[in-house]
Amino acid sequence: MKHLFCIGLTLLCLACASDPQKEMEKKIIGEWCNPYTYESTGELKGFSFKKGGVCEAINIPSLDLKTWSIQEGYLLIKGFSLEEDGKKEVYETKEKIDLLNADTLCVVAHEANPRLVFLYLNAKIIKERVRVDTMSHE
């Protein structure tokens, strides 16, 4: 009887196991900003990922972002880039999610040499963790 109970409990746990993609989608909701831009300029620039796949650029006037999704560990962002001459160009990215937790989003834009990685911090904690370089503002 005890053995059957353990098997039943194990099956229940497997049935209720979380979907890794859904977990990533929950974690990414929020505002993510580039710490290096904040450190050098004091400006928060990055992305706002909202429920339902809505995406907006934060303080980046040249981007008119529309949607985001996660597919097989990749972050996909779609929208338009706005050129200086007023033209709109399709903007689409597909970047591998290297690290995603409550504070940090790290995506790999280019795997081969040179490897290109972008780091973003959650906007809620960036001011606590990154000091603005006041010398560059003078």
Locations of regions flagged by a protein language model:
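Sec-dependent N-terminal signal peptides
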Residues: 4-14
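Lipid interaction determinants
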Residues: 16-138
